[in-house]
Every structure is written in C-alpha cells, then in structure tokens.
Amino acid sequence: MSLPATFDLTPEDAQLLLAANVHLGSKNVQVHQEPYLYKTRPDGVNIIHIGKTWEKIVLAARIIAAIPNAEDVVAISSRTYGQRAVLKFSAHTGATAIAGRFTPGSFTNYITRSFKEPRLVIVTDPRSDAQAIKEASYVNIPVIALTDLESPSEYVDVAIPCNNRGKHSIGLIWYLLAREVLRLRGALVDRTQPWSIMPDLYFYRDPEEIEQQAAEEAAAGEEDDEAKEEVAAEEQTEAADWAEGQSEEVASW
C-alpha cells in the first residue's frame, strides 16, 4: 500500500518503533501474516517490517476518523499491558473503552447492562480478545486488531502487525494510532510539530512500582523538610548570636 508523502514514516517515528521493540515478532508465523515478515534472525525470532506496521496504523486511523460519532468506536484490551493504553486512547479520541474482562453478550445480548452497538471495534490481542471478535462477527462489526506474526486473523478486517506482548510496544501503537486520528480530525493541524502528549503516558505501569515511586518521593520530601528545618535553625542561631554581639557592643559604649 503506497501512502501520500504527507503520511510517510518519519525517522523519529521509526526510532520510536524500534526502541519499543515493535519489530520483534514471534518464532512462528501464520500464513496470513507472511507479508509482514521482514526477515528471521539466527536465533529464530522473526522481524516485523515496521514500514508495513506504519501503513496499517495510518489505514486504521483513517477508518476511525471516518466514523462521525467517536463513541461508536470501542477499544478493548483484556491484556494487562494494554489496559492503560486503551483508557488513554479513549480519553484522547473520545472512543469507548473496555479495559479488563470483556462481558460475553456485550454486542449480541441487548438485555445486559453492558450492551453496546459500536460501528468499529479495536482489540489489543486477537487471542485474549477472541470473545469480542467473535461477537463482532455475529453483528457485522468491522474489527481492527494488533496482531503478532502468529496471531489468528479470522474475523479481523485490519491487522496492525506488531509485537502485541510487550508493554512498550502495545503502548506505542495505541499512542501513534491516537495521534494519527487526531491529525486526521484536524485537532493536530501541523504534522511537523510533535504532539504535546508523550508516549510514556500510554505505557503500562506496575502498581508496586507506582507505590515505590510515591514512597521515594515522600521520603525525599521529608528529607527536604528536615534540611529546611536545619537551615532555619542555623539561621535563627546566627541571628541570636549576632543580636547578642550587638547588645554587648552597646553595653560597652
């Protein structure tokens, strides 16, 4: 698929894709994923062609931007590494997020509270989100999926080839997808200017890591308070010594 020059992959985005290990695929390859295979390393790991990845990101973004009501797009991730990314994507684009377990019947059983009638479904992993893809096929909802080289492509209309198991890779794909959607909608007018949102915001964060960071910040804050108190005490001591010296001079006069 040839893209207009405006949509070409920039060196900066290519570096992001490589740094996030988007190009690292699985050791097995499904027959439908062979067009996205770049080469195989000596250790058996297959490399994904990031140029094909970028083409599919642009195609998916154009499909998403063509839907008038953003809430009719449902972003799904039962995989832990993709839940934060899905929530951020929905916050920035206005889509509906399903982060966590997908409730069976959400697309087919109108009696359930979680019933939805989306016009487009985006999933993080065709294996872990198989229930959502299956129900979407029952009601003719097109599906966009982040797929590895060994991922099944049944009922998937647009496959974005990438490493859909790494937390950085998943977060970056959702980030680039959201950025391209906003550009196509006109929210980000100048393509030469970087988006103010950083890709790190889409990356999964371990709760223990967050608690540890908060504890370190609290400890650092306590140390700063203690240091300020020590400085204030020293200043008070110096002021008292100076005042005492002045009083002695006055007394000697």
From Swiss-Prot:
The keyword Heme does not apply. One of its GO terms (biological process) is cytoplasmic translation. The modification N-acetylserine is found at residue 2. Its main location: cytoplasm. GO terms for cellular component: cytosolic small ribosomal subunit. Keywords: Acetylation, Cytoplasm, Ribonucleoprotein, Ribosomal protein. This is Small ribosomal subunit protein uS2. Component of the small ribosomal subunit. Mature ribosomes consist of a small (40S) and a large (60S) subunit. The 40S subunit contains about 33 different proteins and 1 molecule of RNA (18S). The 60S subunit contains about 49 different proteins and 3 molecules of RNA (25S, 5.8S and 5S). Interacts with RPS21. InterPro entries: Ribosomal_uS2, Ribosomal_uS2_CS, Ribosomal_uS2_euk, Ribosomal_uS2_euk/arc, Ribosomal_uS2_flav_dom_sf. CDD domains: RPS2. Residues 212-253 are annotated as: Disordered. GO terms for molecular function: structural constituent of ribosome. It is found in: Cytoplasm. Belongs to the universal ribosomal protein uS2 family. NCBIfam families: uS2_euk_arch. The lineage of its organism: Eukaryota, Fungi, Dikarya, Ascomycota, Saccharomycotina. Required for the assembly and/or stability of the 40S ribosomal subunit. Required for the processing of the 20S rRNA-precursor to mature 18S rRNA in a late step of the maturation of 40S ribosomal subunits. The gene is RPS0. It comes from Eremothecium gossypii (strain ATCC 10895 / CBS 109.51 / FGSC 9923 / NRRL Y-1056). Pfam families: Ribosomal_S2 (PF00318). Residues 219-238 have a biased composition (Acidic residues).
